[in-house]
Amino acid sequence: MAIERTFSMIKPDATKRNLTGAITKMLEDAGLRVVASKRVWMSRREAEGFYAVHKDRPFFGELVEFMSSGPTVVQVLEGENAIAKNREVMGATNPANAAEGTIRKVHALSIGENSVHGSDAPETAAEEIAYWFSGTEIVG
């Protein structure tokens, strides 16, 4: 299996509850390694740009508002099958449907405040990583 990188974000609902360490530990315990990490407070413009793929969806305004409401922690994770592994550890988008022991089952407040975001494919991982990090910020 090839080592790959993925993008991960700890959302404002989780950072406001001081869950950054607990969530990062869950990711690391699953075999993922943090090779870049920074805490950012998204502007509305940054949130609109990052979530541009959803701009025509009815929840877009609420999503932008939420994502710019407090700090987030953006990370690059590395490991074997990092994209699939990160998504497995995060759990289903709706915490009610998430498997026991996943980040969203343990920490999410609702489908909207679901604590984490992760890339869903190699292409989106590359785009999302590039949105927040320059190459020199990623230290393997």
From Swiss-Prot:
<feature type="binding site">
    <location>
        <position position="87"/>
    </location>
    <ligand>
        <name>ATP</name>
    </ligand>
</feature>
<feature type="binding site">
    <location>
        <position position="104"/>
    </location>
    <ligand>
        <name>ATP</name>
    </ligand>
</feature>
<keyword id="KW-0546">Nucleotide metabolism</keyword>
<protein>
    <recommendedName>
        <fullName>Nucleoside diphosphate kinase</fullName>
        <ecNumber>2.7.4.6</ecNumber>
    </recommendedName>
</protein>
<dbReference type="InterPro" id="IPR023005">
    <property type="entry name" value="Nucleoside_diP_kinase_AS"/>
</dbReference>
<feature type="active site" description="Pros-phosphohistidine intermediate">
    <location>
        <position position="117"/>
    </location>
</feature>
<feature type="binding site">
    <location>
        <position position="114"/>
    </location>
    <ligand>
        <name>ATP</name>
    </ligand>
</feature>
<dbReference type="GO" id="GO:0005524">
    <property type="term" value="F:ATP binding"/>
</dbReference>
<dbReference type="GO" id="GO:0006228">
    <property type="term" value="P:UTP biosynthetic process"/>
</dbReference>
<comment type="subunit">
    <text>Homotetramer.</text>
</comment>
<dbReference type="GO" id="GO:0004550">
    <property type="term" value="F:nucleoside diphosphate kinase activity"/>
</dbReference>
<feature type="binding site">
    <location>
        <position position="93"/>
    </location>
    <ligand>
        <name>ATP</name>
    </ligand>
</feature>
<dbReference type="GO" id="GO:0005737">
    <property type="term" value="C:cytoplasm"/>
</dbReference>
<keyword id="KW-0597">Phosphoprotein</keyword>
<dbReference type="GO" id="GO:0006241">
    <property type="term" value="P:CTP biosynthetic process"/>
</dbReference>
<comment type="similarity">
    <text>Belongs to the NDK family.</text>
</comment>
<dbReference type="GO" id="GO:0046872">
    <property type="term" value="F:metal ion binding"/>
</dbReference>
<keyword id="KW-0067">ATP-binding</keyword>
<keyword id="KW-0479">Metal-binding</keyword>
<dbReference type="InterPro" id="IPR034907">
    <property type="entry name" value="NDK-like_dom"/>
</dbReference>
<comment type="function">
    <text>Major role in the synthesis of nucleoside triphosphates other than ATP. The ATP gamma phosphate is transferred to the NDP beta phosphate via a ping-pong mechanism, using a phosphorylated active-site intermediate.</text>
</comment>
<feature type="binding site">
    <location>
        <position position="11"/>
    </location>
    <ligand>
        <name>ATP</name>
    </ligand>
</feature>
<keyword id="KW-0808">Transferase</keyword>
<dbReference type="GO" id="GO:0006183">
    <property type="term" value="P:GTP biosynthetic process"/>
</dbReference>
<dbReference type="Pfam" id="PF00334">
    <property type="entry name" value="NDK"/>
</dbReference>
<keyword id="KW-0460">Magnesium</keyword>
<dbReference type="InterPro" id="IPR036850">
    <property type="entry name" value="NDK-like_dom_sf"/>
</dbReference>
<keyword id="KW-0963">Cytoplasm</keyword>
<dbReference type="InterPro" id="IPR001564">
    <property type="entry name" value="Nucleoside_diP_kinase"/>
</dbReference>
<keyword id="KW-0418">Kinase</keyword>
<feature type="binding site">
    <location>
        <position position="59"/>
    </location>
    <ligand>
        <name>ATP</name>
    </ligand>
</feature>
<keyword id="KW-0547">Nucleotide-binding</keyword>
